[in-house]
């Protein structure tokens, strides 16, 4: 009993709080206080989220303003390059400014163009008043940059025609990118009137770009036939002035114009009556070779068409212009099939071409196996795509090639086969059709066989050793010609320093400056104008 009493007292002592205010855990807060704290936290989180959103918007706006400032400075630098080209009569500085045009055009907006037009057109109020209504006036704030590229005496001097054309071209490109084609047409028409009255060699390169975008505007408006006479007039002027860049651009625009309306005869006459300038850049050469390849393919000159399109791929930029290379490959595959050759499987596996060339891969399989049913199936499935690519007319011609391939496969498989079985395998209407097709294949040299008209069968002849014919010689000749063409084109594309560089008439400082400029120019030319393809 004593032990039980002492145990109860010890338990009671443990339950009592320690005397003297010792450490003790505080009781948990009541539930309503917890709920109120959560609501306060939620309210505070909402206000924090709004503040974060405002901060992010302000940061994005600040970043955009910085990008606009950089774009304005780039435009200012390009204008300096144009002025330097005019004063020093060096067209390479114009090329340097135009080479950055695709990069600059992607960063254009109303704020940049409004500031540029107001900043540069200080003396020419007529052009400024004409361009500003097409642009939205930005809301000026304290953070906005005061863009004043022309101050003092320069503000009162008129702009150079090259600079004025370049700035107006930027507005045209922005309107095009914004899909405001009607407004772009008005600005471009005004720009063409100004360029047509000028006769300055430094303006030729800028004018060539203006011609290109002028035709693009009319193409988007589906009015290419309206601009054709203007392009012809400018081509005559460019030819008389020996403007190589203008000639190349205008010739390509006219060929594109004719091919858009399927005027192949007029396009062929233009090619035969004109000479494409050798000094044109690689991109214009690539376009010209592609257009001539299309003309040759329609006119049944398949060997010449394959040669020109192969050269077009060689002239095209290596890492960009994917759309252009896809278009050329589509036409080249069809032309090779029409020549009786099977394209290399490797080109169908390239990542940039694999998806777009899938219908042509199925078409190639049908032609290779001589399967007429599969050929008709591919034609029904992808007919609209072939029409959009402009290859449908040529693909229709492939039906005879499919039949020829089927006849050749049958001839290799059977030493003797009836005409009725051939008609059944090729899905022809009657044995008479099979007889006609086999006779034509024998005449064209597709197969070595004879037809027994009385008994209605085809007797294949023994295979001739191909090495006893001229086939190997022709194949080697084709390969050697290809290598020689590459060598000749590489030599023509090389750039040699002028003889004046051999004269030791410059100081060491001038030599260093010149070498630095040459190094920069070489780096820019190495890019080969990759961004010029739209």
Swiss-Prot record:
There is a cross-link at residue 38 (Glycyl lysine isopeptide (Lys-Gly) (interchain with G-Cter in SUMO2)). It comes from the Eukaryota. Residues 1-69, 500-534 are annotated as: Disordered. InterPro entries: 26S_Psome_reg_C, CSN3, PCI_dom, TPR-like_helical_dom_sf, WH_DNA-bd_sf. One of its GO terms (biological process) is ubiquitin-dependent protein catabolic process. The keyword Ubl conjugation applies. One of its GO terms (cellular component) is extracellular exosome. Keywords: Isopeptide bond, Phosphoprotein, Proteasome, Ubl conjugation. There is a cross-link at residue 38 (Glycyl lysine isopeptide (Lys-Gly) (interchain with G-Cter in SUMO1)). Residues 1-16, 501-525 have a biased composition (Basic and acidic residues). Residues 286-465 form the PCI domain. Residues 17-32 have a biased composition (Pro residues). The keyword Phosphoprotein applies. GO terms for molecular function: enzyme regulator activity. The modification Phosphoserine is found at residues 418, 430. Component of the 26S proteasome, a multiprotein complex involved in the ATP-dependent degradation of ubiquitinated proteins. This complex plays a key role in the maintenance of protein homeostasis by removing misfolded or damaged proteins, which could impair cellular functions, and by removing proteins whose functions are no longer required. Therefore, the proteasome participates in numerous cellular processes, including cell cycle progression, apoptosis, or DNA damage repair. Belongs to the proteasome subunit S3 family. Component of the 19S proteasome regulatory particle complex. The 26S proteasome consists of a 20S core particle (CP) and two 19S regulatory subunits (RP). The regulatory particle is made of a lid composed of 9 subunits including PSMD3, a base containing 6 ATPases and few additional components. Interacts with UBQLN1 (via ubiquitin-like domain). Interacts with ERCC6. This is 26S proteasome non-ATPase regulatory subunit 3. It comes from Homo sapiens (Human).
């Amino acid at each position: 009993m004593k032990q039980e009493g002492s145990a109860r007292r010890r338990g009671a002592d443990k339950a009592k709080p320690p005397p003297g205010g010792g450490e003790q855990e505080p009781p948990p807060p009541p539930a309503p206080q917890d709920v109120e704290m959560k609501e306060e936290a939620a309210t505070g989180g909402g206000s924090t989220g709004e503040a974060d959103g405002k901060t992010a918007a302000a940061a994005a706006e600040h970043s955009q303003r910085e990008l606009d400032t950089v774009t304005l400075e780039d435009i200012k630098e390009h204008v300096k390059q144009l002025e330097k080209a005019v004063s020093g009569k060096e067209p390479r500085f114009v090329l340097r400014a135009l080479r950055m045009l695709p990069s600059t055009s992607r960063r254009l907006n109303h704020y940049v163009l409004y500031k540029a037009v107001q900043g540069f057109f200080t003396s020419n109020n007529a052009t400024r008043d004409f361009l500003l209504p097409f642009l939205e006036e930005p809301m000026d704030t304290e953070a906005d940059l005061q863009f004043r590229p022309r101050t003092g005496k320069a503000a009162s001097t008129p702009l150079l025609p090259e600079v004025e054309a370049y700035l107006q071209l930027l507005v045209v490109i922005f309107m095009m990118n914004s899909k405001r084609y009607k407004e772009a047409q008005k600005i471009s028409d005004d720009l063409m009137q100004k360029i047509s009255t000028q006769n300055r060699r430094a303006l030729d390169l800028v004018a060539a770009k203006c011609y290109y975008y002028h035709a693009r505007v009319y193409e988007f408006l589906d009015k290419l036939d309206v601009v054709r006479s203007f392009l012809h007039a400018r081509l005559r002027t460019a030819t008389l002035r020996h403007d190589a860049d203008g000639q190349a651009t205008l010739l390509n625009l006219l060929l594109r114009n004719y091919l858009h309306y399927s005027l192949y005869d007029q396009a062929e006459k233009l090619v035969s009556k004109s000479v494409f300038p050798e000094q044109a850049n690689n991109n214009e050469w690539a376009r010209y070779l592609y257009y001539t390849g299309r003309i040759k393919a329609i006119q049944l000159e398949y060997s010449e068409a394959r040669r020109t399109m192969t050269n077009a791929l060689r002239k095209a930029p290596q890492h960009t212009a994917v759309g252009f290379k896809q278009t050329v490959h589509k036409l080249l595959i069809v032309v090779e099939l029409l020549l009786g050759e099977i394209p290399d499987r490797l080109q169908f596996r390239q990542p940039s071409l694999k998806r777009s060339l899938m219908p042509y891969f199925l078409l190639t399989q049908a032609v290779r196996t001589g399967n007429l049913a599969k050929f008709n199936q591919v034609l029904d499935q992808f007919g609209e795509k072939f029409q959009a690519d402009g290859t449908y007319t040529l693909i229709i011609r492939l039906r005879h090639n499919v039949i020829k391939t089927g006849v050749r496969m049958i001839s290799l498989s059977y030493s003797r086969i009836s005409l009725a079985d051939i008609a059944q395998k090729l899905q022809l209407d009657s044995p008479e059709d099979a007889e006609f097709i086999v006779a034509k294949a024998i005449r064209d040299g597709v197969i070595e066989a004879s037809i027994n008209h009385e008994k209605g069968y085809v007797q294949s002849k023994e295979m001739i050793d191909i090495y006893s014919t001229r086939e190997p010689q022709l194949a080697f000749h084709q390969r050697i010609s290809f290598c020689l063409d590459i060598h000749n084109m590489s030599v023509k594309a090389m750039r040699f320093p002028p003889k004046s560089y051999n004269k030791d008439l410059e100081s060491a400082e001038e030599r260093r400056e010149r070498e630095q400029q040459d190094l920069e120019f070489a780096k820019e030319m190495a890019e080969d104008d990759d961004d010029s393809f739209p």
